[in-house]
């Protein structure tokens, strides 16, 4: 095998290995909106702490999460969280003790909503 052929083979192996490693990367944490309304705001706090994150729906292309839509969540580590959920009609509710796992989907449904202000 010539030196050029050997170099090309090594490069192809490196590229294939990199592509394989990227394919193994997880899908990240996602919120699945199973409520009957469009969510316009989601803030997370470590369970019981009342230290709310920024509005996570702002990362969505239309800045809201429709029924049955999933939203990729970034900047949050796996753990137990409370969620503050807001709707366009000014209603805001809390969901307590959501277990968020790495590379997994967590859902919020109407039955999970507590302490709604309307």
Where are these regions (language model features)?
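Sec/Tat signal peptide C-region and signal peptidase I cleavage site
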Residues: 17-21
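Short acidic/proline- and small/hydrophobic-mixed sequence motifs that coincide with surface turns
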Residues: 37-41
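Bacterial N-terminal signal peptides that target proteins for export
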Residues: 1-8
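Intrinsically disordered, low-complexity Pro/Gly/Ser/Thr-rich segments with frequent PxxP/GP/PP motifs
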Residues: 50-78
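Structured interaction patches on ligand/partner-binding surfaces of diverse proteins
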Residues: 22-23, 86-117
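Structural beta-strand segments of beta-rich domains
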Residues: 25-29, 69
